[in-house]
Amino acid sequence: MSITIKLLVGLANPGPEYAQTRHNAGQWYVSQLASQENIQLKAEPKFYGLTGRIQFAGNDLRLLVPTTFMNLSGKAVAAMANFYRIKPEEILIAHDELDLLPGIAKFKLGGGHGGHNGLKDIIQKLGNDKNFYRLRIGIGHPGDKNRVSGYVLGKAPSSEQNLIDQSIDEAARCTHILGQDGLEKAMNRLHSFKAEK
């Protein structure tokens, strides 16, 4: 059973100082999809972000990278969803995930925010509706919750970055499977992916 995704969002903090930080993994994924489709993301002030449009499983798919700060991501997501009348279950949010190792990415439908400030704001701005898809991109955990903030706002060493990049490439390929064949097939492929060190 195919799934209609109409809005794909990559969470990030704006500005060059954050571009290569782990917290911006969601943006790396959306940029990868845009580059595969040969489109440039453009600033769109009314949606508080960088936007683009591709054809996806026969439907228009809007791409969005909020240029608000992470904890205000919901403002951009809600603005675009409201304008195009996109329901929460037609949205896929890509974000960095502390609870997965670098090189691992997983699709998921629904759930809480797990302490992720971007997800927290999106859930709130969508009227507490959590029923959207997520792509969780593993960045690993620093081992101490007091070090999380510095960790997500830091750059991964090149060995870890290579693993993250591989998982993002595979996730981009699996996104097409998600649209054409449904969540189960996309999950089966993505969740069995092994990044090469």
Curated annotation (Swiss-Prot):
Among the GO biological process terms of this entry, one is: protein quality control for misfolded or incompletely synthesized proteins
Q: Which residues form the active site?
A: H23 (proton acceptor)
Name where it's found: Cytoplasm
| Class in the EC hierarchy, top level | hydrolase
Asked if Cytoplasm is a keyword of the record, the answer is yes
- Cellular component, GO annotation: cytoplasm
Which InterPro entries does the record cross-reference, listed alphabetically? Pept_tRNA_hydro, Pept_tRNA_hydro_CS, Pept_tRNA_hydro_sf
Provide the residue positions that the database annotates as binding tRNA: Y18, F69, N71, N117
Main location per UniProt? Answer: cytoplasm
What keywords were assigned to this record? Cytoplasm, Hydrolase, RNA-binding, tRNA-binding
Superkingdom of origin organism:
Bacteria
Enzyme Commission code(s) on record:
3.1.1.29
Per its record, the protein catalyses: an N-acyl-L-alpha-aminoacyl-tRNA + H2O = an N-acyl-L-amino acid + a tRNA + H(+)
The record, for Pfam families, names: Pept_tRNA_hydro (PF01195)
Keyword Glycosyltransferase in annotation: no
Q: Name one GO molecular function term.
A: peptidyl-tRNA hydrolase activity
Site (described: Stabilizes the basic form of H active site to accept a proton) = D96
The family line of this record is: Belongs to the PTH family.
Describe its partners and assembly state. Monomer.
> What does this protein do, in the record's words?
Hydrolyzes ribosome-free peptidyl-tRNAs (with 1 or more amino acids incorporated), which drop off the ribosome during protein synthesis, or as a result of ribosome stalling.
Q: Which HAMAP family match?
A: Pept_tRNA_hydro_bact (MF_00083)
Q: What's the protein here called?
A: Peptidyl-tRNA hydrolase
Question: What is the species of this protein?
Answer: Psychromonas ingrahamii (strain DSM 17664 / CCUG 51855 / 37)
